Amino acid sequence: MEFIPTQTFYNRRYQPRPWTPRPTIQVIRPRPRPQRKAGQLAQLISAVNKLTMRAVPQQKPRKNRKNKKQKQKQQAPRNNMNQKKQPPKKKPAQKKKKPGRRERMCMKIENDCIFEVKHEGKVTGYACLVGDKVMKPAHVKGTIDNADLAKLAFKRSSKYDLECAQIPVHMKSDASKFTHEKPEGYYNWHHGAVQYSGGRFTIPTGAGKPGDSGRPIFDNKGRVVAIVLGGANEGARTALSVVTWNKDIVTKITPEGAEEWSLAIPVMCLLANTTFPCSQPPCAPCCYEKEPEKTLRMLEDNVMSPGYYQLLQASLTCSPRRQRRSIKDNFNVYKATRPYLAHCPDCGEGHSCHSPVALERIRNEATDGTLKIQVSLQIGIKTDDSHDWTKLRYMDNHMPADAERAGLLVRTSAPCTITGTMGHFILARCPKGETLTVGFTDGRKISHSCTHPFHHDPPVIGREKFHSRPQHGKELPCSTYVQSNAATAEEVEVHMPPDTPDRTLMSQQSGNVKITVNSQTVRYKCNCGDSNEGLTTTDKVINNCKVDQCHAAVTNHKKWQYNSPLVPRNVELGDRKGKIHIPFPLANVTCRGPKARNPTVTYGKNQVIMLLYPDHPTLLSYRNMGEEPNYQEEWVTHKKEVRLTVPTEGLEVTWGNNEPYKYWPQLSTNGTAHGHPHEIILYYYELYPTMTVVVVSVASFVLLSMVGVAVGMCMCARRRCITPYELTPGATVPFLLSLICCIRTAKAATYQEAAVYLWNEQQPLFWLQAIIPLAALIVLCNCLRLLPCCCKTLTFLAVMSVGAHTVSAYEHVTVIPNTVGVPYKTLVNRPGYSPMVLEMELLSVTLEPTLSLDYITCEYKTVIPSPYVKCLRYSECKDKSLPDYSCKVFTGVYPFMWGGAYCFCDTENTQLSEAHVEKSESCKTEFASAYRAHTASASGKLRVLYQGNNVTVSAYANGDHAVTVKDAKFIVGPMSSAWTPFDNKIVVYKGDVYNMDYPPFGAGRPGQFGDIQSRTPESEDVYANTQLVLQRPSAGTVHVPYSQAPSGFKYWLKERGASLQHTAPFGCQIATNPVRAMNCAVGNMPISIDIPDAAFTRVVDAPSLTDMSCEVPACTHSSDFGGAAIIKYAASKKGKCAVHSMTNAVTIREAEIEVEGNSQLQISFSTALASAEFRVQVCSTQVHCAAECHPPKDHIVNYPASHTTLGVQDISATAMSWVQKITGGVGLVVAVAALILIVVLCVSFSRH
């Protein structure tokens, strides 16, 4: 059956379908039951049906099939028959499945909203019109096949791999709508159904392919739910990499192993001014195995081409023999290389030599302690270039030789564990040590080794120093060298090796020198006669010459060699080089670390006593969660008891790899605020010792002063009374005056004489006179208590109660503390309506600064190319735009060193040394980013209890962004404090953030942070200042000595200290991606609420309460809802009422209760007051509650207070009662004394 092209059909242009033969009509009848008598009848009916119902045109296909079979047997094409029977050949192509309903619907919608992206005439992907944007995957190269869209200015987002631009006005009608609603189920795209489940889009494997990048995924309403970027093959199904939307926020879903689905564009390479696809090299040369030298020259010519590795792969795998062994293609590149000899400073017993196992580089960037060692031998490859895991090959003089891998060893202070080998590289886990040795045993059972000084101290993962991974523990972020032999982004340079001197090739024969080549190409030069130099591949005799006058070297230009600073460069080939990928890339992974035993914790008064049991050295750190964190840390190696003071703001303790422990103190004490004076003083002394001592001292001084004043006034009055009678002989003191002044009437006597007289003569009068002042004091105290002007309980409750959270309009504004996890209630009073209670709780608060990246810094790698060594030739350095590049020419080096200098010079040589710095291979994972931090934006998650429903919303706290909770509009912010824990300059390293005044870009200092700088981990622009200085080589062996400052990045890693996650004030939690501070308990959060009229309940519709009374049977202050109050009421009708405390210092747990008839309700409240007096409003009626609260029994709790904490505790009613009594008694004494003094003075003045 032939189909109309899809675009034509769905482009709304109708064309009649071509005629095709009608299908054969077959009547399918039910299978007859097996009956003995009806068997023949059933066969007859079946035969008749076949004869009458079968169509004639069906015979034609049988002939075609017959001809087809004959044609396959003959295998001789006939021109006439082939021309006529060409359509039957294409019949399998016509059997394509007809597009289903999903495909047809998608094609119809796609016809208007997607456009092809073309590059050099080929479709590489698609662009889609969605909403008011045209979207194209950023990895799709090319331009949109539309004149209007091609000229748009696109904005690129590398994070989402997307490019966007505004749709032209005249094309907005063609755009598709988008939606963030994605219920699990099936969706549609160009190739059929897409399943969405578990947050992932999947399709049957094979339904998508490269070239589909940019295609949209639609729901059943034709709305775009995602745009395809690529896919990851997972067996029977393929997981799609897509860009989608979640509540108007763009998100990218990338499954592991996803590949981009843009159509690959062939990369071109160059050969003799002729371009060709890099994946298809020409046949001259086309294969390394046929023409190795020419193939390597071709690769060197294209070493900087983007398709170099395609060309390398194609050149090395073009042989059929190698294709059959493609499972070992990762080792295939090593057939174009060879091992080599290089200088080793210690080959055993302190002697240096040219070793076959020379150490080139030791890398220790992995935080799990694994070492990556580069040596001069090659592991896993035999001398015939075949792969064998059990073998290694090394350079034996100038010929490679095989050895067993089992003889390979690595050791520091003790033998290491080799975890991976390939080519020049070894992975090993080693104990601590100061040297590193690599060795092997060759086929002759001779041991070779090389030792380098190297300080190895495995880093600490996490906060515990452990030696082996536990079976159970905590997964911690770390980095390691992945044990993968596949090609990676890391690479090394290789070049053509220099000629290798070999004196054994020459022998003296009767005054002549014979050169034996042994099937090699040998370069020779003799200083006897003329024309005694050149290349030879056959044995050659130099007449009339001596061996000492000749020099012979093996020339091999069929293999590359690692570009080592320990081996000279081939002078003839200059800077020609190649590149190969290396195994074992550094990657971020997780390492399982132990979790320290939980400490035994004992709580004291404002302190925590922790008994620690470390199994190995474990880090203990703690900080205050207030404005001054006072961060402290220490490594605990043995059992230890620590005492930590818990401040009012809370204490955060981190022990090992456990989650942090958080503690808050409670106002616990041994005394009570409702007892005797000494108990009250003890209560306040334990809570506030300094203030209590000051207050008691001042009060005692005042009282004693008052008593002293009273005594002084009495003495003055008595003296005024006695003086006139003492001066008059025989005077008699009046009775009333003698009674007031305590003197005898007839004869003035001292008080002591009067007291002695009464004690001896009239003891009842003595006691009566002593009781009179006490009785007067008691009477005066009772009078003072009955005075209406006396002060009631003086508490901070009266101050805090002013201005309860009420408002008389539907526009309500309130301010809540910026404390996460503490509910906050506000009451909305509107005239004519029943009060409404709103409960709000901050679930999280985020401060996200605006960052601008200055640069990234990481460990640098010093690149030392093989030096140029020439014989008495002039060499000149050339300027190169390389980071920290240094070049020097040294003359007169390596005197009389033929073999060492690889040079035909018997006097002196000239060496050109070069060096520069570049980013280490570890920079892709191990780097620190230097940011400038600007104004921070605040946002938060808010839980709102509104109309009986708990709703969680996210809002920006900027005073402008509005969120809707049902039918109410909430506007949060701006925050009362613009505080942020981040300085103007911050450094981000993995998941840690540090405040640091780093040097600006281009001004780094050697050995410090920023000594090497780059804009991004992938960028090529690198600035470096490492104090790299080349030094003169010493005699003995070819080398490039230099001096350089140590890596500033590695030094910073050791000295960086604690991150903001541990040192930030106000208990901030710091996170990255993006950089943000969460749940900082600082400042207040204003909230504006716009409540519609329909949300209120009229007073006539709400129940009214009467006869309300409140009783508090139990109350524990400073505890989480430790108070209980019983409110009795009489309700007019059944209904719901809002419950709210009219005092800030008291928080009620319940927000709404149901009332009915004469009943009572119990509410729980929390307060910090010892003597709480507050009013509770239920519906529109208020009731007064008074509670005498006792201190909590728990000293420390692991949750913050749910009530307003007062800076100074209130004074209880009992304490005020004692103050009134004591003050009243002393005041009465002073008043009586003053009255007596006044009367005496008046009488005294009247006489004069």
Swiss-Prot record:
What name goes with this protein? Structural polyprotein
Query: Which intervals lie on the Cytoplasmic side per UniProt?
Result: 714-748, 785-795, 1246-1248
Q: What is known of its domains?
A: Structural polyprotein: As soon as the capsid protein has been autocleaved, an internal uncleaved signal peptide directs the remaining polyprotein to the endoplasmic reticulum.
Q: Where is the composition biased (Polar residues)?
A: 1-10
GO molecular function terms noted in the UniProt entry: RNA binding; serine-type endopeptidase activity; structural molecule activity
What InterPro entries does this protein map onto? Alpha_E1_glycop, Alpha_E2_glycop, Alpha_E3_glycop, Alphavir_E2_A, Alphavir_E2_B, Alphavir_E2_C, Flavivir/Alphavir_Ig-like_sf, Glycoprot_cen/dimer_sf
Reaction(s) this enzyme catalyzes, per UniProt: Autocatalytic release of the core protein from the N-terminus of the togavirus structural polyprotein by hydrolysis of a -Trp-|-Ser- bond
Give me the ranges of the annotated region Dimerization of the capsid protein.
183-193, 219-223
Q: Looking at its record, which EC class is this enzyme?
A: hydrolase
Give yes or no: UniProt keyword Cell cycle.
no
Stretches the record annotates as Interaction with the capsid protein: 716-720
Outline the segment boundaries, as ranges, of region: Transient transmembrane before p62-6K protein processing: 721-741
The record places the motif (Nuclear localization signal) at: 61-99
Organism's domain of life? Viruses
The active site of this protein is located at 139 (charge relay system), 161 (charge relay system), 213 (charge relay system)
Marked site, Involved in dimerization of the capsid protein, at: 187, 220
Give the organism the record lists: Chikungunya virus (strain Nagpur) (CHIKV)
- What are the Basic residues biased-composition ranges? 60-72, 86-101
Q: Where is the lipid attached (S-palmitoyl cysteine)?
A: 721, 741-742, 1242
Q: Where is this region: Interaction with spike glycoprotein E2?
A: 155-160
**One Pfam family cited in the UniProt record for this chain:** Alpha_E2_glycop
